[in-house]
């Protein structure tokens, strides 16, 4: 599971790393939480060009009655992307990358828990695999862009912290993940520990 993450880099860093023309202004945070708005990278459905937008964490499908639905959809299990009603349309049409400086997991028992930060070994960002949706408020008609982070089975040391981990897309595969026609199976395989640094938060 990924329930908190760190995005402490500024918009200029995201723009350069993810090769987008601009990034909306946002406040860098060491503790991004569900329902908060943060940058995502997507392919614009009209221009078919890569861009960054601000979106709300917690995917809300177009058919959902209200934004509360998103609290159940902060993570999307990779095993259910094709079958789950909440995710299958977005998986076929609306993939995104979620820029993070690191993400967090906890170990230990209640009252004695240790918070761990998992971050890239040799680059400023992870690009986490995500899906995005646009939901329209039934009262105002205002659009709300939302997203979820795709998870897979954890491997290596991370498996000792949690049985799930985000799908981390390496920079050479960003374009492939953003292309919904691409179904390369290696896109969905957990990265090796060699590319990760795990440290007390």
Label the predicted regions.
Residues 1-201:
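Short linear sequence motif anchored by a di-proline
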């Amino acid at each position: 599971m990924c329930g908190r993450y760190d995005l402490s880099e500024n918009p200029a860093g995201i723009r350069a790393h993810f090769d987008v023309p601009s990034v909306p202004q946002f406040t860098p945070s060491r503790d991004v939480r569900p329902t908060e708005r943060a940058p995502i990278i997507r392919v614009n459905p009209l221009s078919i060009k890569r861009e960054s937008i601000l979106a709300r964490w917690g995917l809300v499908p177009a058919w959902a009655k209200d934004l509360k639905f998103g609290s159940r959809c902060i993570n999307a299990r990779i095993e259910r992307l094709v079958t789950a009603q909440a995710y299958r349309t977005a998986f076929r049409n609306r993939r995104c990358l979620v820029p993070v400086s690191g993400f967090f997991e906890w170990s230990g028992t209640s009252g004695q828990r240790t918070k761990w930060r998992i971050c890239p070994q040799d680059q400023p960002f992870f690009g986490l695999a995500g899906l995005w949706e646009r939901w329209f408020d039934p009262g105002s008609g205002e659009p709300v862009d939302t997203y979820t982070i795709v998870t897979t089975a954890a491997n290596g040391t991370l498996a000792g912290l949690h049985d799930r981990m985000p799908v981390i897309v390496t920079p050479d595969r960003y374009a492939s993940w953003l292309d919904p026609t691409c179904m390369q199976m290696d896109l969905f395989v957990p990265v090796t520990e060699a590319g990760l640094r795990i440290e007390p938060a």
